[in-house]
Amino acid sequence: MLADDAAVESVALSDSNLLDRFGGSGIHVSMSTIAPETARDLAEHHAKKGVAYLASPVIGRPDRAATGTLFLLLAGEGNAKQKVQPLLKVLGQRIFDFGEKPWIANTAKLIVNFNIVAAIESMAEAFTLAVQNGIPRAKMAELLSETLFSGVAYKGYGDHVARHEYEPARLSIAVRLERRAPGFTARSRN
């Protein structure tokens, strides 16, 4: 998975003729989190070269990838999706199919990321209120993540927020996502 839109475009659309190397029967599965507009442009470029383009951004951190327990969002041409299913099943515990338009999977992923950022912000505010009233941050994290909010965002990020652990790479992605989310939501449309 590449870091951002520029990296994906650099690899897929550079002078290296990557798309020509695929030939008419190739399938490019992009698992990066990129803007829907970028995915739409990539799909158009791929179609011109006769290469199938699938978007399959993932939900899960590197430790989930190592254990094959990612969640995968998938969109693109049906036959191409069918061909890559065996590979994707090795990487993830579940595949969510978002239809024929690749950029829809990227839109769904950015919506997920927006909710992760909202959860992190909510936890930070809750922990601040807790500390101001004599409740330890760790105790509040435990309460939230084991009762009302037992989902991945609270369990996966709650302890880090409670311990003020934002680096290396634990929550730095959230800062980048938060910067992108307002622009994404303002521009998003099908």
Each language-model region and where it sits:
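Rossmann-like NAD(P)-binding element
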Residues: 1-37, 71-73
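Structural signal for hydrophobic packing residues in well-ordered secondary-structure cores
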Residues: 2, 46, 88-95, 148, ...
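Short phosphate-engaging motifs
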Residues: 7, 38, 79-80, 122, ...
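Rossmann-fold dinucleotide-binding core
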Residues: 11-12, 33-113, 117
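A short helix-coil junction within the Rossmann-fold of NAD(P)-dependent oxidoreductases
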Residues: 18-22, 45-46, 129-132
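Helical "substrate-binding/catalytic lid" subdomain
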Residues: 104-190
